[in-house]
Amino acid sequence: VCSSDLILVVFDNHTYEVAGKRAVELLKENGFNVKELLFDTGDDILIPDEKTLGRIVQEQDLDTSLMVAVGSGVINDSVKFVTSRSGLPYIIVATAPSMDGYVADGAPIFSQGYKYSPVAHLTYGLVGDTDILKTAPQDLIQAGYGDVVGKITAIADWDLAVKANNDYRCDTCVTLVNRALDKCFAKAEGLKDRDPESLGALLEALTLTGVAMALVNISRPASGAE
């Protein structure tokens, strides 16, 4: 992407204040051509449905070379889905360490009232600034930590699936996930105080489990009976 290319930055009214405004400023300061897409939902929750996805497609000009998603689950999944279909790369600016889907190869969306998770491409880059993450609501931080705790049973379930169903098991992915979990658990005490190192370790664990899922093209490294 060069400075003459168009970058579409996508955010809602909440993530704009947290990180979107600064992201746009930084891009413009560095000479990039930027277009902004704001989902002004008020106090309502943005849904990754046909209306949301269609709006992103509508705002994607023909000379758009990159999208930047500023948010967490819904914003990331929506931009991931659209760019995977249009062939554009995208970058996610994480605003909360709340889930493991930032770099996973699925994009949960709603279609005709039903939720499903079509395959989508991976993000070109993930920005996880702890100065941004520490502003996330505590319940989202707790959700992310709960997601990490669930990986313990996910790995155990994977072992069981190998024995019971002769499933494929990737030792590299298991090692990757376990190391990330150990680091996160060692620093978990600091999450209640929004300690930057603890938040960084949490996002790293969530990110690496997403990477593990993408590597084996199944959810076993990160999801099981939990």
Segments predicted by a language model, with ranges:
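Short, small-residue-biased leader/transition segments that mark boundaries at the very start
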Residues: 1-3
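Alpha-helical scaffold segments in soluble metabolic enzymes
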Residues: 22, 55, 59, 81, ...
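Solvent-exposed alpha-helices and their adjacent loops that cap or buttress functional pockets
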Residues: 59-62, 83, 116-121, 125, ...
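Active-site segments that bind and position negatively charged phosphate/pyrophosphate groups
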Residues: 172-226
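N-terminal small/polar loop signature for handling phosphorylated ligands or for N-terminal nucleophile
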Residues: 8, 13-91, 190-201
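A glycine/threonine-rich phosphate-anchoring loop and its flanking beta-alpha core
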Residues: 81-183
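Hydrophobic beta-strand segments of well-ordered beta-sheets in folded domains
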Residues: 5-9, 124-126
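Alpha-helix capping and helix-loop boundary segments enriched in small/acidic/polar residues
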Residues: 40-47, 114-115, 136, 220
